[in-house]
């Protein structure tokens, strides 16, 4: 979502709009969610309907609501013109049988289909338009939801989506019109600025402005945390970046960064959040830790259906969000505090978290760090105590394999059996254990091949 302050216009995609306001799914670590791979569904529909089915149709519509203009756009998966009817199609693949599809799981896809159907009706001046949502597991397991409405009915449903999104648009408008100008004009929060701090800040500003890197060493007591955050906030207000990530390796330094963010927020109103480790904030960690399925955790069941109200409440009440505020709000709405905190980062200017959220492939922020190339968002990365990064990287990209575990499995092929406690699961396909036991160097060579495919860099064989 982007907000144009001059035109008072919100630019948002259909996918983001519906994901924000009609995502009623549950948290399910088993992967039973809808997946974005739509090629198989498109192939199926093209084979079934031929030229009557058109893939990838771009649509957009601008409406006025609550004093703002909304420009909603997206690419509809397909349009079916058959039997005098025009139908907007939304397709999705699932990781399990379609019999598991519930109304909550389908809500987001239906919302997207309604939005595209309305935009199609407006673009082609249709009195009646239909939508079809197709869920595909395999050729023998396909589920379809299909309905038809008048253009007026579709418009009413579309405007309801916009109205549900208005609180989130207001947050973005506040960021652009209030917080960023205040951040640009941010005054140093202390009476005096030490010369070492001034030099430190100049290096940070230079690195941010020109897109470089700065490795800065300063003695204890210099005020490094504020010296790093203050120029980063100024740069944020000047448009050099969209978000600041403050990476730490210790809880104490994270709390120091949170305290510095509070001082800056007191005058500029910038929003900051501290992300705790999933293991620490899991509400069932004492009973059945991190069993993220609707059956095991009641908070996982329908989590996203309750998240929107919780986000609106906490960002209204807090500028700087700590673990206590997250837990209190999560308890009130019966949602997962960890997933809740991840969603809150999208409404914050400063994200304070462990460096594993960047360097660990299993934990990193996919919503922020998966994109690459031109056009990707610009972020400011601040690493506290950067000398700890080497050991953390070794721990994140490494794995430990105990020879005693291998011997227990005899001469069978090793496949997902080397799972050391507290370490990443190590998978070696078609590595014969007879060679492993009697010639460990063969094992190491096998792991090096596996390493090149899986991007693991360090391996330790413990006898």
Where do the protein language model's features map onto the residues?
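Metal-dependent nuclease catalytic cores that hydrolyze phosphodiester bonds in DNA/RNA
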Residues: 1-81
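Mg2+/Mn2+-dependent nuclease catalytic core
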Residues: 61-156
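Conserved pre-motif I regulatory segment
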Residues: 175-216
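A substrate-engagement module of RecA-like helicase motors
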Residues: 181, 187, 240-351, 355-359
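Walker A/P-loop
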Residues: 210-231
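Walker A/P-loop NTP-binding motif
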Residues: 225-239, 260-263
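Signature of the SF2 helicase/ATPase Hel1-core->accessory helical subdomain module
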Residues: 333-334, 338-350, 355-425, 430, ...
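Alpha-helix boundary/capping motif
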Residues: 417, 436-437, 442, 452-458
